[in-house]
């Protein structure tokens, strides 16, 4: 790092705001945004620089980081799949669908009473915030052929455990592939690509409809193979079996297909009927088979990704339930059905109240309520899913829960190319850790981020180093991996302002905006960052009583969680989360 170009001290003065009042300040008293508050500004700002030039602390690189969506989880990836026993018959109804008969069969009452909270659904969400819009199928994956998935002669995805084994219909895989194709159909303007994306989505929907099982006045989609999970006791199935995740996601598929402009009116009617029939399955409890919905002993509603062999049992899987709940969102927005809203209310109430069962403080969250196995592969999905629950309900509680998961174990995917960490002048400790290999250098259950060595390095002036990973180290804080130079492969702890990742990373947009509270008699320095090469400005505020401000975003900005203020004298400033309290607790 010592050989890197010299970091020039920003020539603009570090702006110190004189004491006094803030006219039109962003912060207000009394928990509303309708009145102005008087904030005492410190006569001199605390020294935030602490060995680092102001031009680094108060500016951002031109391009910030992002929070990429990880690949969808493989529902069967950690289990063992096998052919059904000889002579096993996989039922299916088949035949022509009579939409009126399906509509008439929809239950008009809930399967049982369960806990709710009065959550409503935001039916006016921007397009990009709606379910599955963040997961387009790429053009390179429109005709997949991998070890686990391939297309059959009808263009339908088949799932196989390896190259040498015949494939099977796997409802969740087919549904998620189709939903991705629908999103890509919406996004692309290329006629050839639109045609193929729509063809793929239609093919998956047709297979589901053809293979449906009509039972208890509802549609179910069978899994035609045996499967068990070696770590989750009780998750063991003989064909045919059913999944609440597939049932809920199928509702999203049929509703979203019915809304496309490229289908015929006959198809539109069919897809709406398919959505009705599938929705009915979420109104059938566990008092008969098949079932995917039950109430636990505390009165909470569950949509079981993996229903148990007996009533009231199951894996109580968190991600599968939320993905299924998105189907209720789609169904209510399309139909206004009040039972769908009631089920949605119950499902999100369950997720809110079981958050502490999902969370593992300062580490990976748990996969399910029953076994509480931490899972690296699903933690980021939990973050994304709680973010969408916040958007759909408008509740700050889900936003706060998402923020908590980010703090516990932030997205550990590779940082954007060109990411750098700033180092203050002085002595720093570097660590050699035992991790998985490139490109993630992630946590491994056999390695546990074991410390292999340490090194003290001293810099006479502030410097920067390229980094490629930012993640939590087991039993420690957040660390960066240095990716080039004399210290390539060594890790250093995030410690603002001594060591921090430059730029905006892991951004989250809130809808509606949230409320930040400035506690009384606490000096808090807010920053309006300059672009690269331009030093930003600061305002240090202190209020005699608790004062509130609206914010629309949260991100890791130059190495610490911050919220973006949107009104009054602090408009455009970032305030540090922590000293500034956020709603939703």
Q: What is the meaning of each model-derived region?
A:
Residues 5, 51, 56-161, 165-167, ...:
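Terminal, non-catalytic domain-edge segments
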Residues 457-494, 541-578:
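SH3/SH3-like beta-barrel superfamily modules
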Residues 415-443, 501-531, 585:
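SH3-family beta-barrel domains
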Residues 445-460, 531-544:
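SH3/SH3-like (including bacterial SH3b) beta-barrel domains
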Residues 1-13, 22-28, 36, 46, ...:
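N-terminal secretory signal peptides
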Residues 103-118, 124-164, 198-220, 272-295, ...:
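Long, well-ordered core segments of solenoidal/helical folds
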Residues 175-192, 248-266, 323-338, 381-395:
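Well-ordered alpha-helical scaffold segments within catalytic/enzyme domains
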Residues 128-166, 217-241, 292-317, 360-381, ...:
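Carbohydrate-binding/catalytic loop surfaces
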């Amino acid at each position: 790092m010592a050989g890197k170009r010299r970091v020039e001290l920003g020539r603009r003065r570090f702006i110190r705001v004189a004491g006094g009042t803030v006219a039109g300040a962003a912060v207000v008293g009394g928990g509303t945004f309708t009145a102005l508050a008087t904030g005492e500004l410190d006569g001199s700002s605390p020294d935030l620089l602490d060995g680092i030039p102001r031009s680094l602390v108060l500016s951002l690189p031109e391009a910030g980081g992002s929070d990429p969506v990880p690949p969808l989880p493989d529902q069967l990836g950690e289990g063992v799949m096998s052919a059904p026993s000889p002579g096993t018959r996989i039922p299916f109804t088949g035949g022509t669908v009579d939409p009126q008969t399906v509509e008439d069969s929809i239950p008009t009452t809930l399967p049982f009473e369960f806990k709710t909270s009065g959550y409503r659904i935001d039916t006016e969400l921007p397009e990009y915030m709606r379910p599955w819009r963040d997961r387009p199928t790429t053009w390179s994956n429109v005709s997949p052929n991998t070890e686990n998935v391939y297309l059959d002669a009808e263009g339908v995805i088949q799932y196989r455990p390896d190259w040498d084994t015949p494939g099977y219909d796997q409802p969740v895989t087919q549904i998620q592939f189709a939903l991705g194709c629908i999103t890509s159909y919406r996004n692309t303007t290329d006629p050839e690509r639109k045609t193929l994306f729509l063809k793929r989505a239609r093919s998956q929907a047709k297979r589901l409809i053809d293979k449906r099982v009509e039972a208890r006045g509802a549609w179910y989609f069978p899994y035609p193979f045996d499967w068990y999970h070696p770590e989750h006791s009780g998750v063991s199935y003989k064909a045919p079996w059913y999944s609440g995740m597939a049932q809920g996601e199928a509702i999203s598929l049929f509703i979203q297909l019915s809304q496309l402009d490229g289908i015929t009116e006959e198809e539109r009617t069919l897809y709406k009927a398919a959505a009705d029939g599938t929705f009915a399955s979420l109104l059938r409890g566990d008092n008969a088979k098949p079932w995917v919905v039950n109430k636990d002993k505390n009165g909470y509603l569950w949509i079981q990704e993996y229903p148990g062999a007996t009533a009231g049992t199951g894996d109580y899987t968190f991600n599968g339930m939320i993905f299924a709940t998105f189907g209720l969102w789609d169904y209510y927005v399309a139909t206004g059905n009040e039972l769908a809203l009631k089920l949605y209310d119950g499902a999100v109430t369950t997720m809110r109240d079981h958050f502490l069962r999902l969370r593992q403080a300062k580490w990976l969250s748990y996969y399910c309520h029953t076994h509480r196995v931490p899972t690296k592969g699903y933690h980021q999905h939990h973050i994304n899913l709680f973010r969408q629950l916040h958007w759909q309900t408008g509740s700050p509680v889900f936003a706060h829960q998402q923020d908590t998961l980010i703090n516990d174990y932030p997205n550990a995917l590779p940082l954007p190319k060109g990411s750098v960490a700033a180092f203050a002048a002085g002595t720093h400790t570097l660590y050699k850790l035992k991790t998985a290999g490139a490109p993630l250098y992630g946590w491994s259950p056999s390695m546990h981020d074991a410390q292999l060595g340490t090194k003290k390095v001293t810099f006479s002036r502030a410097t920067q180093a390229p980094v490629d990973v930012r993640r939590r180290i087991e039993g420690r804080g957040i660390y960066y991996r240095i990716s080039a130079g004399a210290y390539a492969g060594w890790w250093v702890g995030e410690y603002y302002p001594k060591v921090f990742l430059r730029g905006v990373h892991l951004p989250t947009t809130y809808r509606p905006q949230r409320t930040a509270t400035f506690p009384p008699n606490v000096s808090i320095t807010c920053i309006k960052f300059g672009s690269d090469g331009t030093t930003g400005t600061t305002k240090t505020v202190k209020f005699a009583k608790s004062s509130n401000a609206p914010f629309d975003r949260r991100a890791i900005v130059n190495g610490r969680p911050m919220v973006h203020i949107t009104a009054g004298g602090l408009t455009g400033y970032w305030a540090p989360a922590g000293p500034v309290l956020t709603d939703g607790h």
